Amino acid sequence: MMIEPYYEGMEQQKKYPIRNTETVELAWGGKLVFNTCIVGGAIDARFMPAILKGIMEKMEEGPLTGSYARDIVVNVFDGKMHPVDSNEMAFKLAGRNAFKEAFKNAGPKILEPIYDIEITVPSELMGGVMTDLQSRRAVVMGMDSEGMNTIIKAKIPLAETYRYSTALSSITSGRAVFAMQFSEYEAVPSDVQSKLLKAYEEQTKDEE
């Protein structure tokens, strides 16, 4: 099994001949593109739905940090059948296990929700607000003037907005207001991903 990240307009892989493609719109967002690349009858076509089901179960459980996996191309190019033990359950389990291993080897990235944030603040207090935004991994996209106020437009990870209302009120003595709206998902920085993976490993170790 070979896994690739999916994105709109991407070219199909050329390493293995694709016999059939199924695109699944995932209930939690994003897509799964399932390519059957089996040649020579290594796996009967009747078992491919079971493999797909196993993959989707593992994607929903979260093979990396317990969070949904999305926007993935899966290429199934080889396998084996047993004259007695081959059945749908066996291939569903094989699909789960193969996906888990291939997913980790594919260098997956953890995505986080990014929000557009617009802050209206008295111009003389803008510096403190900007410093706080930088500490929250926000990216300032632009600023406008409106009378005695400055409107700051930025993108900020949702994870960094915890208690932001309280912090902004403290910085500006309650003289600033803000509004937020979902924008997109982006990969977290590598240092943040390392911390999340370590925390998840410790959590699952404690649960065992």
Report residues per predicted region:
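Accessory interaction regions appended to the cores of large information-processing enzymes
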Residues: M1-E208
